[in-house]
């Protein structure tokens, strides 16, 4: 299995993504943002960071990069695309996922571990998690507040397109770290092949760091190929 990790100027989670994919047994290769051909890859990973310095809006300039034309074709063919943090922002700016990621309600960059509940486990990314499991995953963003108009929110909820939702790790009342509507932490496309999420599963895959809650996310992709 061979995945492309897109490197945008300002991205800083590309090495984390490579480590996580390779730990799961997936061959990972870096692809520069000027690339126009993604043939030969089984999946595409858009990593976190600050692409183009977050000028205009987070992900706005990266969404216009040449590689995104290839990513769009890749997604339209039904192949897997994952965007984490800035990658999620890029997917919404490119129109590959609905909604937008706005500034956190506290107007601060927030970096901590949060509770993330698995809403669906019938996708390659989540099939190794029990539905309803609350994961402990890191976040690190200043613009992670998911927003969509009421009609879009109703469609996301009605069609089961919300995959991850912020949830209490213990009994804390302020578990939503950024003010995302409906506590949304991650969504998927109607075809189920394009996933965007703000928490970082790739930063929770190693026992040395004391947390492997993100590893099944990547192992599920391997299991999908083996089916």
Swiss-Prot record:
Its main location: cytoplasm. Residues 2-227 form the Glutamine amidotransferase type-1 domain. Pathway: Purine metabolism; IMP biosynthesis via de novo pathway; 5-amino-1-(5-phospho-D-ribosyl)imidazole from N(2)-formyl-N(1)-(5-phospho-D-ribosyl)glycinamide: step 1/2. Keywords: ATP-binding, Cytoplasm, Glutamine amidotransferase, Hydrolase, Ligase, Nucleotide-binding, Purine biosynthesis. PROSITE patterns: GATASE_TYPE_1. It is found in: Cytoplasm. It catalyses: N(2)-formyl-N(1)-(5-phospho-beta-D-ribosyl)glycinamide + L-glutamine + ATP + H2O = 2-formamido-N(1)-(5-O-phospho-beta-D-ribosyl)acetamidine + L-glutamate + ADP + phosphate + H(+); L-glutamine + H2O = L-glutamate + NH4(+). The active site is at 85 (nucleophile), 200, 202. It comes from the Bacteria. Part of the phosphoribosylformylglycinamidine synthase complex involved in the purines biosynthetic pathway. Catalyzes the ATP-dependent conversion of formylglycinamide ribonucleotide (FGAR) and glutamine to yield formylglycinamidine ribonucleotide (FGAM) and glutamate. The FGAM synthase complex is composed of three subunits. PurQ produces an ammonia molecule by converting glutamine to glutamate. PurL transfers the ammonia molecule to FGAR to form FGAM in an ATP-dependent manner. This is Phosphoribosylformylglycinamidine synthase subunit PurQ.
């Amino acid at each position: 299995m061979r995945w492309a990790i897109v490197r945008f100027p300002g991205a800083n989670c590309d090495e984390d993504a490579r480590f996580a994919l390779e730990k799961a047994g997936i061959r990972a290769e870096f692809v520069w943002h000027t690339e126009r051909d993604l043939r030969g890859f089984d999946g595409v990973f858009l990593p976190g960071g600050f692409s183009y310095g977050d000028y205009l809006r987070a992900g706005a300039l990266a969404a216009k990069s040449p590689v995104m034309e290839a990513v769009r074709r890749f997604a339209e063919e039904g192949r897997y695309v994952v965007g984490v943090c800035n990658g999620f922002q890029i997917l919404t700016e490119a129109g590959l996922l609905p909604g937008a990621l706005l500034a956190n309600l506290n107007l601060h960059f927030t970096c901590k571990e949060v509770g993330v509940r698995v809403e669906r486990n019938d996708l390659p990314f989540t099939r190794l998690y029990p539905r309803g499991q609350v994961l402990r995953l890191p976040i690190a963003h200043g613009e992670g507040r998911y927003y969509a108009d009421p009609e879009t929110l109703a469609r996301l909820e009605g069609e089961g397109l919300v995959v991850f939702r912020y949830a209490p790790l213990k009994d804390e009342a302020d578990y939503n770290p950024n003010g995302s509507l409906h506590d949304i932490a991650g969504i998927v496309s109607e075809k189920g092949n394009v996933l965007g999420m703000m928490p970082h599963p790739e930063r929770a895959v190693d026992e040395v760091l004391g947390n492997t809650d993100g590893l099944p996310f990547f192992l599920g992709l391997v299991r999908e190929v083996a089916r």
